[in-house]
Amino acid sequence: MEGVGGLWPWVLGLLSLPGVILGAPLASSCAGACGTSFPDGLTPEGTQASGDKDIPAINQGLILEETPESSFLIEGDIIRPSPFRLLSATSNKWPMGGSGVVEVPFLLSSKYDEPSRQVILEALAEFERSTCIRFVTYQDQRDFISIIPMYGCFSSVGRSGGMQVVSLAPTCLQKGRGIVLHELMHVLGFWHEHTRADRDRYIRVNWNEILPGFEINFIKSQSSNMLTPYDYSSVMHYGRLAFSRRGLPTITPLWAPSVHIGQRWNLSASDITRVLKLYGCSPSGPRPRGRGSHAHSTGRSPAPASLSLQRLLEALSAESRSPDPSGSSAGGQPVPAGPGESPHGWESPALKKLSAEASARQPQTLASSPRSRPGAGAPGVAQEQSWLAGVSTKPTVPSSEAGIQPVPVQGSPALPGGCVPRNHFKGMSED
């Protein structure tokens, strides 16, 4: 713990820099509006194209190779909590309001360009469609997140208190909203799937293939928020080559050796179920008593979409109609800038006892997850244009866990809806 204690003054100094407090990137890493071009000096990991790099490869430059155990990040993209490494998600949940929804205030840096803003807003809207989480505009709340384009993709786990940074560099947005969803799941209190306490039943960690010194990113957690069976298709799962030293797999699935892991397309069905279970709610509000997790339709007309969702959709629709979006506003609504002269500083999470771990069950795979399967009918990447044109206000209900069997996916599936890697944004050229 001595190394960690000596590190915190440096970390706090980093988070107090003007580029962080003002919700703007560091001047050396982002001049003007941060676009979606790949920064100079970054090289692909192994044979991966630069646009296909996942979180570990993007963040690798933030971790000192000589002493990776002293990094301010753990597990590749999580800001190290202090003084203890792992906490139960129930100790730092975001509070539920009287309306039965969980509001997470956010600030979006004005340094993002319009395509980048659209990707981030799409991720916020996906949570609102599928869960009781509502990302609302910051209005002097004590606890809030500040989304800024620093170097790398990282966040804290759960509500830390005061302002907490969510870094989404332009490279984190090149593959669409998947990495944004991943980091926001951290914000809501969830750790990585591949570090679950029961992970050894479902994956094998190939320690000899991990970059020397980076083994700390594969240590099993003691977090108790598993809540659902192991899910190979979770947006919280890292890919096979995470922190690979020579391009060979560091993670091997055991139940389905050829299954795709590390998808960054959308929330899986179990990702949604975890959010609903952790916060004790349904997609439209609190969980109905005596009727299970999801209430069925009563035949009445659906309630209007919430104001926050309407604002997000208006912004996205306006941008989709504009042939050349520019400026710092979207859909006639100004995009909030950084936190400015925020009176709130960084605070450590509260320490609580860990609750009992959920019993292990069979893992889910990409093929068995209706939301993560390419071309699936649930509102995800494949239906992006349909909900922009006219979104249904009836929330999507994730499939039941019962009867789900792990089915291996042969090879690497195509992106949903005909999406092309590294060409998510308007105007981006194919390399």
Swiss-Prot record:
**One of this protein's GO BP terms?**
negative regulation of binding of sperm to zona pellucida
Domain Peptidase M12A, chain residue ranges per copy: 85-282
Q: Which UniProt keywords apply?
A: Cell membrane, Cytoplasm, Cytoplasmic vesicle, Disulfide bond, Fertilization, Hydrolase, Membrane, Metal-binding, Metalloprotease, Protease, Signal, Zinc, Zymogen
Gene Ontology cellular-component annotations: cortical granule; cytoplasm; plasma membrane
**Bias kind Polar residues: ranges:** 319-328, 361-371
List required co-factors. Answer: Zn(2+)
User: Which pairs of Cys residues are joined through disulfide bonds in the record?
Assistant: 132-281, 153-172
Tell me the cofactor note.
Answer: Binds 1 zinc ion per subunit.
Pfam families given in the database record: Astacin
The entry's localization annotation reads:
Cytoplasm; Cell membrane; Cytoplasmic vesicle, Secretory vesicle, Cortical granule
EC number(s) on file: 3.4.-.-
Detail which positions bind Zn(2+): 182, 186, 192
- Which SUPFAM superfamilies does the UniProt entry name for this protein? Metalloproteases ('zincins'), catalytic domain (SSF55486)
On whether Membrane is a keyword of this UniProt record, the answer is yes
Name a GO molecular-function annotation.
metalloendopeptidase activity
Say if the entry is tagged with keyword Cytoplasm: yes
Cleaved signal peptide residues: 1-23
Pathological condition linked to this protein in its record:
Oocyte/zygote/embryo maturation arrest 11: An autosomal recessive disorder characterized by decreased or absent fertility and poor embryonic outcomes with assisted reproductive technology.
Subunit structure as annotated in this protein's UniProt entry: Interacts (via N-terminal domain) with SPACA3; the interaction occurs during fertilization.
According to its UniProt entry, the function of this protein is described as: Oocyte-specific oolemmal receptor involved in sperm and egg adhesion and fertilization. Plays a role in the polyspermy inhibition. Probably acts as a protease for the post-fertilization cleavage of ZP2. Cleaves the sperm-binding ZP2 at the surface of the zona pellucida after fertilization and cortical granule exocytosis, rendering the zona pellucida unable to support further sperm binding.
Q: What is this protein called?
A: Astacin-like metalloendopeptidase
Which organism does this sequence originate in? Homo sapiens (Human)
